[in-house]
């Protein structure tokens, strides 16, 4: 059973890795939209709320769709002041507890509560109240999709932590850095 769960975890990891890498390009798109908007506004005195809202949509996509990717790479903000004093097994148990009782319930609740908002916007073909009339449902869809990716990655991380505690897989959180990078980091701190 655990081998099948570990395979599922690897599949979830691969999906979030691919989504994250694809969404990186939206940062460039947001920068380009912002630059074109500023250039049009200051050069030709043309301004459009649609361009500003498009920037907002792109930023929302980056923020929401990369949450699972960020969790995959253990880059979410956490307070390590206390946990750094614990053994690795204790840290893993804290991660299991936090994932089961905080991350997953919160992500499931947000998914569940945001789905009707998306459906309402989709069925009513809701548009922006600002000039430009961008449809709102794509931005509303980002919320449940982003939290689905985050909760799936949370399940993957839970599987990996339990696999580690059972001795079935190595610690996936160990940082394996390039020795040259470690030497540079050591030199920089001197």
Region locations from a protein language model:
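Alpha-helical transmembrane segments and membrane-interface helix-loop junctions
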Residues: 1-190
């Amino acid at each position: 059973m655990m081998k099948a769960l570990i395979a599922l975890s690897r599949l979830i990891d691969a999906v979030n890795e691919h989504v994250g890498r694809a969404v990186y390009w939206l940062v460039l798109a947001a920068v380009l939209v912002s630059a074109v908007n500023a250039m049009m506004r200051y050069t030709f005195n043309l301004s459009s709320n649609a361009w500003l809202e498009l920037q907002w949509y792109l930023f929302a996509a980056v923020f929401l769709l990369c949450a699972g990717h960020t969790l995959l790479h253990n880059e979410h903000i956490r307070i390590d002041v206390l946990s750094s004093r614990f053994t690795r097994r204790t840290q893993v148990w804290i991660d299991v507890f936090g994932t089961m009782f905080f991350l997953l319930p919160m992500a499931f609740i947000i998914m569940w509560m945001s789905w009707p908002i998306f459906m309402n916007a989709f069925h009513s073909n809701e548009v922006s109240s600002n000039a430009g009339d961008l449809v709102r449902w794509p931005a509303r869809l980002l919320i449940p999709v982003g939290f689905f990716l985050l909760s799936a990655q949370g399940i993957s991380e839970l599987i990996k932590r339990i696999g580690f505690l059972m001795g079935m897989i190595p610690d996936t959180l160990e940082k394996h850095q390039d020795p040259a990078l470690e030497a540079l980091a050591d030199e920089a701190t001197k």
